């Protein structure tokens, strides 16, 4: 971490690892390596498929979504999810229009243009309570799907979210390998 803030503040960040749900007990080990491939830290976790504390998602209550581009099944294509952030239920038609604009813009450039037939793009209508995104530097806090905000690392236009679990919960049951969070703001961030 090269930001100045990292020299004075220690912080933890959510992370998610997507893997097939095991049919029988499995052991998963995650290792963090340095630039010399030396393991600095590792975590081992046993997964017991019938554990009552595992919340299986993606079978019920799947977030409403619409394919903007569908060139094949999920196994054969690169699946990109475009998530709504800062769009209320009433603004979902605007979100779908904005998502189509983003999709069209992506495929107007190489190498995406020549590889368009290898992609599926799905717009995911993750509703927010408030319209727009938070701007802490102006004292504006919004209740949104994944709690995104400007002023990350105290930079005015640095827009991000730390709610990685929320992102994946909204996308549960929808095929994706890559995620674009489309924020309802006119500010470039």
Predicted regions and their residues:
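Active-site-proximal segments of metallohydrolase catalytic domains
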Residues: 118-189
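Short, surface-exposed beta-strand/loop "edge" segments at domain boundaries and coil↔beta transitions
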Residues: 36-40, 89, 186-189
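Sterically constrained small-residue positions within well-ordered secondary structures
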Residues: 8-10, 19-21, 71-73, 112, ...
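Acidic/glycine-enriched edge-of-secondary-structure segments
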Residues: 48-57, 86-88, 143-157
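Fold-level signature of zinc-dependent metallopeptidase catalytic domains
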Residues: 56-108, 113, 123-135, 165-166, ...
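Hydrophobic beta-strand residues in large extracellular and virion-surface proteins
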Residues: 28-30, 80, 180
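Beta-strand-enriched, solvent-exposed domains that form extended recognition/catalytic surfaces
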Residues: 1-55
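Residues at beta-strand starts and edge strands
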Residues: 13, 24-26, 76, 117, ...
């Amino acid at each position: 971490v090269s930001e100045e803030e990292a020299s004075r503040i220690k912080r933890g960040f959510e992370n998610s690892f997507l893997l097939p749900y095991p049919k029988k007990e499995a052991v998963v080990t995650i290792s963090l390596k340095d630039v010399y491939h030396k393991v600095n830290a590792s975590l081992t976790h046993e997964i017991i498929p019938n554990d009552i504390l595992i919340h299986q998602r993606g079978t019920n209550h799947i977030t409403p979504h619409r394919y903007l581009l569908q060139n094949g099944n999920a196994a054969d294509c690169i699946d990109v999810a475009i998530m709504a952030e800062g769009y209320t239920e009433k603004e979902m038609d605007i979100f779908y229009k904005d998502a189509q604009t983003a999709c069209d813009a992506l495929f107007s450039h190489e190498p995406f243009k020549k590889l368009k037939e290898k992609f599926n793009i799905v717009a995911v209508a993750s509703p927010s309570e408030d319209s727009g995104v938070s701007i802490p530097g102006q004292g504006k806090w919004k209740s949104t799907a994944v709690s995104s905000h400007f002023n990350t690392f105290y930079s005015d236009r640095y827009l991000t979210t730390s709610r990685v679990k929320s992102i994946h919960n909204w996308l549960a049951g929808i095929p994706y390998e890559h995620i674009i969070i489309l924020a309802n703001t006119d500010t470039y961030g």
